[in-house]
Amino acid sequence: MKKLFLFAVSLAFEFAGFATPAAAGASRDYISIVGSSTEYPFATVVAEQFGKTSRFKTPKIESTGSGGGLKLFCAGVGVEHPDITNASRRIKKSECDTCNKNGVKDIVEIKIGYDGIV
């Protein structure tokens, strides 16, 4: 199972495991995304549009901050953990180590764009 780490904003819903088997017999029918509060407004719009224009449910987006999102993402694999995290920075080596220790392997980091506050 691959989980995604998205750098900047989350537009790569197509890469997430929509019906990924998590725990024995457990599944969810939506994508769970956590992360950056600066990316939250854009990610919400993209998620709503995705839900309207695809055969999938609208992803659930939570604003937890980049660090908080990565902490949740790296905590483990299964329906109780998010599928994707948005961050306004790159993943740290220590976060990668935590992910690997908790069974979150094959992380894919995708740079979607840049953000900024003016």
Descriptions of predicted regions:
Residues F7-G17:
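Bacterial N-terminal signal peptides
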